[in-house]
Structure formats: C-alpha cells, structure tokens
Amino acid sequence: VTTLRERLPVTVLSGFLGAGKTTLLNHVLGNREGLRVAVIVNDMSEVNIDAALVRGGEAALSRTEERLVEMTNGCICCTLRDDLLEEVDRLAREGRFDYLLIESSGISEPMPVAATFAFARDDGATLGDLARLDTMVTVVDAVNFLPELAGGDELVARGLDQYEDDERTVSDLLMDQVEFADVIVLNKLDLVDTATAERLAATLARLNPAARIVPVSHGRVRVRDVLGTEAFDLERAQQAPGWVRELNGEHVPETEEYGISSTVFRAERPFHPGRLWEFVTEGLDSGAFGQVLRSKGFFTLAGRPGVIGLWSQAGSVARFEPTAAQDEEAPFAQELVFIGTGLRGDALGAALAGCLVTGDEVGSGALDDPFPAWDVHGVVCE
C-alpha cells in the first residue's frame, strides 16, 4: 500500500494570464534546495510559450533531476485530462521525483484539475493512488485583479474561450481561482502602493478565509510556501469560500480598517421577479450599497414554484440558474451572502426586502418575469 508520504506530492499553479505563474515557477526551480522536481506546463497555444520560458529561465532543467512535460493546444481541466492522468501516472511510477509542479493555463479553473486526482480509470484505479494533491496555489496580479474583476469581459471576446459555447467571464474565472486556493500568492506588489496592497490582501482573505496569503514581488516565494505544505483537503476546499462560511454561520471577523465586510440576507417569501430583476440590473452595481465584489447563495422566484435558484455574482457579472428542487420544510426561501467594500448592509437588506412578493401579489395571477427561462430538466422531478 502506498502511504501518504510515499505518494508523489503535487502542487497545482493557477492564475489568470499575466499574473506571474511562469515567473514564480522559474523562481521555485532556481531555488529548489536540492529537491528533484518534475514540471508539467499547460499552455493553450500551439507553441508552448510557458515551456520555452521555463527552459530559458534562471533554472536550467537537469535531465537527471528534473523533467519538463509540455501539454499544448488544450486545457488540462477538460480536453487534456486523459493526457494529464497518463503523465502524472508515469512520473509517479518512476519514483525519481520529490515533487511535481503543474502549471495550468491562465484560463483553467482549479477545481476540475483537482478532481482529476479522484477520477477513476477503466481498471478502477485513481491517480490519487500514486500521487496526492499537496497544494493548490493561485497567483493574483496585484495591479489588475480588481479592475479585471469589475470589468466583466467575456473570455470569448478576448479569444480565450476554452470550448464551444464557453460563456464564462474573466470575473467568473478569477473568483473560481481565488476561492479554491490553499495558498494565494499576491504578486507584483512592487507595482502598487502599500494601502492598495493591504486592501487587496484583506479582500482576498474575505473571499477565501481558509487560504494563506503570501505577498511577493517578481514571484519570489519561499519554496516551502508552495511545496510540501500538505494544505490541500477536498472537503475543506469545498467549504473554504467566504460565502459558504457566512451561510454556515462562521462569520469572518470584519476587516474594518480596509472597509471590507459582509452581510447575509434571509427571507421566507419568494422574490417578485420583476422587482428583483430591476434591483439586479440597476441597483446592485449602482454604488448605492457600496462596492459589492461577490454575492452568492440561493433564492426563489414567485411564479417558478418548486425550484431553488443559484445566485452567483462576481464583480460586474451575475448569473442566476436553477440548482435544486425546493424543500417545502426549509426555513428560508432566500439565503444570500454579499461581500464588498463600504457595504451598507441595512440599506442592501431593505432593498432586497422590497423585492419580496407581498401577500396581495401571491394570488393575483401572473407576475412580470424578465428573468431568462430556466431549463429545470434534471433539477425538478417531473
């Protein structure tokens, strides 16, 4: 039986394009303190630019101590998962390496990469039998993180779509990468002032209270910050995002000096779809309630009985999708968490309360409903 210590420890590097993943990778390889490190680099282009940078960086790859595997023209969280399985399996079986570093592409979500380690092959074996996820690292660009989050650009508009009908936005991706991290490397701090750096660190701590935040410039982390931390735990990772903790009643202490806080809205009645739509499209992003960086939770709409919706907003982008059949015995129809700077929680709560359906409206017939139709197949039993 392969023990925890014997299995090949794996660190996965995530982060949006330009955040500094390859610079950090080069720094780790150049300061690896005698450790034997294998590297898998994933780049979406036909020519693997990241692999070339690693080869030409300060850490020349030794054929005896290190191995560089290139994966191009696809993303390891979807099209190249079988290739990733094969490569990690091979490297683990060789038994020559102390650590494996995987640099995912700038448009990869970390959770599917992590799930690869639990993916069962045809023979029933999993990658986790030979290798173990040790640390999920996300590199954040201190200069561009908040502007990109607020921008709301679609990946397809930048030519960064991963698959057909890829509807994700930059905001979605940034939030996924931050919320699933064990370690968040806040990079490029030499390019921002102290106040901005402190506010960013506090914001990231609110979005993912469980992650360790490592402030650096030029990707210069200590090797022990990203290798051999034994920080990854799938169950903990799924409960790590700040919004999940708030809904569970695990309130994160306020970081008042930076003006970052959170508020929870709960209600028993469903929302009036017309009033809620007006609030979402005109009120939420107006600044009247502060700057809402993240909101997420569960909600119901009058006129759509039996269905619970998932509310997910990151920066300027909000999504509303059906997620489950409604439990008639559940105490609340609405459970929403809002995280942001300068939040006016009372005003936000009052505005949301004003969107709830009234007793008179319940039996008054069809309500104005501008929300897109929901495909509830597979969500609600017919």
What does each model-identified segment do?
Residues 40-42, 138-141, 185-188, 264-266, ...:
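Conserved beta-strand segments of the P-loop GTPase G domain that flank and frequently precede/overlap
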Residues 43, 103, 136, 181, ...:
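Residue-level signal for inorganic ion chemistry
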Residues 51, 81, 111-114, 194-198, ...:
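Conserved strand-to-helix beginnings and helix N-cap segments that scaffold or border functional pockets
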Residues 52-58, 201-204, 350-354:
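Short, aromatic/basic amphipathic alpha-helical patches
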